């Protein structure tokens, strides 16, 4: 059985991708960041998410691989993505096929618009 955690912007699978197919593997975790491209990402922000993921994996080292643990990790990463959005390191992709502001409404810099 494939263990997984799915949030709006983070998907974690207990498995690997081989020939474009997800193959269950309880010795490897695969992270999919923002699969619907709802956010605008830069390399630095993506690296921050991967580092946070690595930290979470390390913190669960020695624990059983369970759906509950994956969901906890997914939730923590989703909150981390929200913090990146709130700090302005990433932004909503207004050209996305779906505009779902699940992390909060977009902020507009009123001073910049007045100039």
Curated annotation (Swiss-Prot):
InterPro entries: NdhM. Keywords: Membrane, NAD, NADP, Plastoquinone, Quinone, Thylakoid, Translocase, Transport. Its EC number is 7.1.1.-. One of its GO terms (molecular function) is quinone binding. It catalyses: a plastoquinone + NADH + (n+1) H(+)(in) = a plastoquinol + NAD(+) + n H(+)(out); a plastoquinone + NADPH + (n+1) H(+)(in) = a plastoquinol + NADP(+) + n H(+)(out). It is found in: Cellular thylakoid membrane. It comes from the Bacteria. The keyword Transport applies. It is a peripheral membrane protein. Coiled coil: none annotated. GO terms for cellular component: plasma membrane-derived thylakoid membrane. Its main location: membrane. Disulfide bonds: none annotated. It is an enzyme of class 7 (translocase). The keyword Ligase does not apply. NDH-1 shuttles electrons from an unknown electron donor, via FMN and iron-sulfur (Fe-S) centers, to quinones in the respiratory and/or the photosynthetic chain. The immediate electron acceptor for the enzyme in this species is believed to be plastoquinone. Couples the redox reaction to proton translocation, and thus conserves the redox energy in a proton gradient. Cyanobacterial NDH-1 also plays a role in inorganic carbon-concentration. Belongs to the complex I NdhM subunit family. NDH-1 can be composed of about 15 different subunits; different subcomplexes with different compositions have been identified which probably have different functions. This is NAD(P)H-quinone oxidoreductase subunit M. The gene is ndhM.
